[in-house]
């Protein structure tokens, strides 16, 4: 039978002498620590087995290490264990419990860290080593060696800026007086004889309770009414909450966050008791009573507080605790609710105060508006009274304008808010009709321009720059022009003859910057253009003595592209008239020349090729070249059209009908013993008949060079019996001179092209300089010969309006907006140029 159980301690561990054997019996320690996952198995030493609970433990021995067990100290003296049997763990626990209740507290019961540590000595411990264990050596004379030196430390400090009597540091923030020490009265622990703070410490650091002291005091006062199971009397400490703390708590927990709201709806199953309980929020768990389960033995309800003993629970009344806690919670909620109500009332007072200030301002504004409206009403009633037929002092147009100026200057807001259209219709329109009653626009085209300009600034709505009849109800000035001024214009246009265009053009030029754009468009499209179209249809170029351009071209600045539909019938009628035309009749050039810049280049060239060039070719084909008797009329008739037809068309006529006959005559002349001086003059004479632009053409240049080559071959071939003296030299000189002129002309042309390229490069470099979008549009308008100018007094949403040809535009943040039928449409610059052409 094994006797290992005799050496087992109360915790079920085996002594170090038999560490290779272990008993698997279940002890009380195993039952108590069954559910303790952090339990540590402490192997009992020989000293613990000998002395039991009175064994002295060194803190160094209990320090955890990486090894499974502590290494044996073979330098320690040998100790012997007396024979005998150890008591069981249960008996030792009972003895310890009985001793704890009766025995007084001794110094050995305190942890060994609070008392002097005993030094265990053995037989082999040297006596010389015992002096280090009893205590520390006195250091009263420490630093006495300084008085035998030169004081180098003090000198070094003074070199670094130290001033005697002041603290160390950059700002002298160090302490001056050394820290005072206070000797403890006895050998007790810290705080056993009262406060140990010195007078200097109390002055520098006033007494303030730490958080740990406050927590200990709170735990004592909290459990004052309960009896301690251990039997010792403790002073309870209560927790107090101020009203401010409750208010702060109420402000923080006023609104639940989203996760808290979600957790408040979570279903919780409590399986900690004998029965399964279901809660529908985590808050219900906090209100659960701490009542022990019925039917369980008292021992199973008590949880051990330590590994060796279990502390009995105190006297508990969960129902009373719940009621008290409920009363406390209700009181806290009432305080929090009252605080919230008070804050709400204060906020309401502030809000009402601001509302009162705002309403006071609104009331003052309304009073001013009422006062101004009353004055405006008086002025309007005065105008209405003077508009009556039986009034002795009738209202004039100038006086009415002054009244409206007063309304606009002094009562601007009321004037803009009022219905100006109805006011103008009732007062201004009758006076305006009376003013223009005897007006004849063709005789006095500037009549009424000043008065209408004044009323334009008074009545026109800047926010509604309308250009269509649908906006008449929103703009008083547009309605005034349409209903009062426009009937006189319609009446006079119906009586106007289109061939007498100057009075009508002057009239519209005088009013173009005053009347709205859409009204001007209506006059040109609906009144003027139909009259011109009808007159063009009745025009006959063979019988009419008045040229058509004399009464069509004056309309170009106003109508521009609107006249495009008239050009096709005009070209058709001119083409019919030129069927029997001969180049000897110069009247055709006089009729066609004004239309060269009006027609597009393509249509003009097509018209010339179809109707003029064939006639000139026939005339040039009839030309007879005779050096002895030359008739130049036919040649002059053709050359006279040089500016009207293109250079390529003229050169084509010369190549086909002139140069073959001219070279043939030259060859015949050279083959009959000619006079080379006369041939030279004849050559230079014909060449002088052409302009530089024609001579610069490569085909013409080749023909004249061919004539020079023929002349050189004639003088160098010795044809004939007689050769004129100096003829060869003269022809050679002529050839050299002509070639030099051609070379100089080509060099001059190249120089001009280089200069033009340089100018274009300068222009491109200048154009690379940042400019605004308006400057770019202006540059493009100049390049394409399009009129670009601002419309005086016209704005749309605060943006200046411009006329780009016949199109009305405005520019907003680098975007061009073109007036459409009802709205403004953004467009590109190239599309704008195409529309303007």
Curated annotation (Swiss-Prot):
Residues 1-21, 53-72, 85-133, 179-236 are annotated as: Disordered. The keyword Phosphoprotein applies. Residues 1-13, 53-64, 103-116, 217-231 have a biased composition (Basic and acidic residues). GO terms for biological process: biomineral tissue development; negative regulation of protein-containing complex assembly; spliceosomal complex disassembly. A motif (Nuclear localization signal) lies at residues 700-705. Residues 149-195 form the G-patch domain. It comes from the Eukaryota. Pfam families: G-patch, GCFC, TIP_N. The keyword Phosphoprotein applies. The modification Phosphoserine is found at residues 2, 59, 98, 144, 210. Residues 1-50 are annotated as: Required for interaction with DHX15. Keywords: Biomineralization, Cytoplasm, mRNA processing, mRNA splicing, Nucleus, Phosphoprotein, Spliceosome. It is found in: Cytoplasm; Nucleus. Identified in the spliceosome C complex. Found in the Intron Large (IL) complex, a post-mRNA release spliceosomal complex containing the excised intron, U2, U5 and U6 snRNPs, and splicing factors. Interacts with TUFT1. Interacts with DHX15; indicative for a recruitment of DHX15 to the IL complex. Interacts with GCFC2. This is Tuftelin-interacting protein 11.
């Amino acid at each position: 039978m094994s006797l290992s159980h005799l050496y087992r301690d109360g915790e079920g561990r085996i002594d170090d002498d038999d560490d290779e054997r272990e008993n698997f019996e279940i002890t009380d320690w195993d039952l108590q620590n069954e559910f303790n996952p952090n339990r540590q198995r402490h192997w009992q030493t020989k000293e613990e087995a000998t002395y039991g609970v009175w064994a002295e433990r060194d803190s160094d021995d209990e320090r955890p290490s990486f090894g499974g067990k502590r290494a044996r100290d073979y330098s320690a003296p040998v100790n012997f264990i007396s024979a005998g049997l150890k008591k069981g763990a249960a008996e030792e626990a009972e003895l310890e419990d009985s001793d704890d209740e009766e025995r007084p507290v001794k110094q050995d019961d305190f942890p060994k860290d609070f008392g002097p540590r005993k030094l265990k000595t053995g037989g082999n411990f040297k006596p010389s080593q015992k002096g280090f264990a009893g205590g520390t050596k006195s250091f009263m004379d420490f630093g006495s060696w300084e008085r035998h030196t030169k004081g180098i430390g003090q000198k070094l400090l003074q070199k670094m800026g130290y001033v005697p009597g002041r603290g160390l540091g950059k700002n002298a923030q160090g302490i001056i007086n050394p820290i005072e020490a206070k000797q403890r009265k006895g050998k007790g622990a810290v705080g056993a004889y009262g406060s140990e703070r010195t007078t200097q410490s109390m002055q520098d650091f006033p007494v303030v309770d730490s958080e740990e002291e406050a927590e200990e005091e709170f735990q004592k006062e909290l459990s004052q009414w309960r009896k301690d199971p251990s039997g010792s009397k403790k002073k309870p400490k209560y927790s107090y909450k101020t009203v401010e703390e409750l208010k702060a708590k109420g402000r923080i927990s006023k609104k639940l966050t989203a996760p808290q709201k979600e957790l408040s709806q979570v279903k919780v199953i409590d399986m900690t008791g004998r029965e399964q309980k279901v809660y529908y929020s985590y808050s219900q768990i906090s209100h659960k009573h701490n009542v022990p389960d019925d039917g369980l033995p008292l021992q199973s309800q008590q949880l051990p507080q330590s590994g060796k003993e279990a502390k009995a629970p105190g006297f508990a009344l969960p129902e009373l605790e719940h009621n008290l806690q409920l009363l406390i919670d209700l009181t806290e909620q009432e305080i929090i609710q009252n605080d919230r109500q008070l804050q709400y009332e204060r906020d309401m007072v502030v809000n009402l105060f601001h509302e009162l200030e705002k309403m006071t301002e609104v009331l003052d504004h309304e009073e001013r508006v009422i006062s101004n409206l009353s004055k405006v009403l008086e002025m309007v009633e005065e105008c209405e009274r003077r508009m009556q037929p039986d009034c002795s002092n009738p209202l004039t147009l100038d006086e009415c304008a002054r009244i409206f100026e007063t309304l606009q200057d002094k009562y601007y807001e009321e004037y803009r808010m009022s219905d100006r259209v109805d006011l103008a219709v009732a007062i201004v329109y009758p006076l305006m009709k009376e003013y223009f009653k005897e007006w004849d626009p063709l005789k006095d085209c500037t009549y009424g321009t000043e008065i209408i300009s004044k009323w334009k600034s008074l009545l026109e709505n800047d926010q509604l720059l309308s250009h269509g009849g649908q906006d008449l109800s929103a703009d008083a000035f547009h309605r005034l022009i349409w209903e009062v001024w426009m009937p006189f214009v319609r009446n006079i246009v119906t009586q106007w003859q289109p061939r007498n265009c100057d009075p009508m053009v002057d009239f519209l030029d005088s009013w173009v910057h005053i009347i709205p754009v859409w009204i001007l468009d209506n006059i040109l499209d609906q009144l003027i253009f139909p009259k011109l179209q009808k007159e063009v249809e009745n025009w006959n170029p063979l019988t009419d003595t008045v040229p058509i351009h004399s009464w069509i071209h004056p309309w170009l600045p106003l109508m521009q592209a609107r006249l495009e539909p008239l050009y096709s019938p005009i070209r058709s009628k001119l083409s019919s008239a030129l069927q029997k035309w001969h180049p000897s009749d110069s009247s055709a050039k006089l009729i066609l020349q004004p239309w060269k810049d009006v027609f597009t280049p393509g249509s003009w060239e097509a018209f010339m090729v179809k109707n003029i060039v064939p006639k000139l070719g026939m005339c040039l084909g009839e030309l007879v070249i005779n050096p002895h008797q030359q008739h130049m009329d036919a040649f002059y008739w053709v050359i006279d059209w040089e500016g009207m037809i293109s250079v390529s068309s003229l050169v084509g006529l010369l190549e086909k009908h002139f140069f073959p006959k001219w070279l043939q005559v030259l060859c015949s002349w050279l083959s009959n013993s000619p006079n080379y001086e006369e041939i030279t003059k004849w050559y230079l004479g014909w060449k002088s008949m052409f302009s530089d632009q024609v001579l610069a053409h490569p085909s013409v240049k080749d023909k004249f060079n061919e004539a020079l080559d023929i002349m050189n071959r004639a003088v160098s071939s010795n044809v004939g019996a007689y050769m004129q003296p100096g003829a060869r030299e003269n022809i050679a000189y002529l050839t050299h001179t002509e070639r030099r002129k051609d070379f100089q002309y080509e060099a001059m042309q190249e120089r001009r092209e280089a200069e033009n390229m340089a100018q274009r490069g300068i222009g491109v470099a200048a154009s690379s300089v940042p400019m605004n979008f308006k400057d770019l549009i202006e540059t493009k308008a100049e390049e394409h010969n399009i009129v670009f100018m601002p419309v005086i007094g016209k704005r749309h949403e605060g943006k200046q309006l411009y006329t780009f040809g016949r199109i009305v535009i405005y520019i907003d943040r680098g975007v061009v907006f073109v007036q459409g039928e009802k709205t403004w449409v953004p467009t590109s610059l190239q599309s704008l140029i195409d529309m303007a052409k």
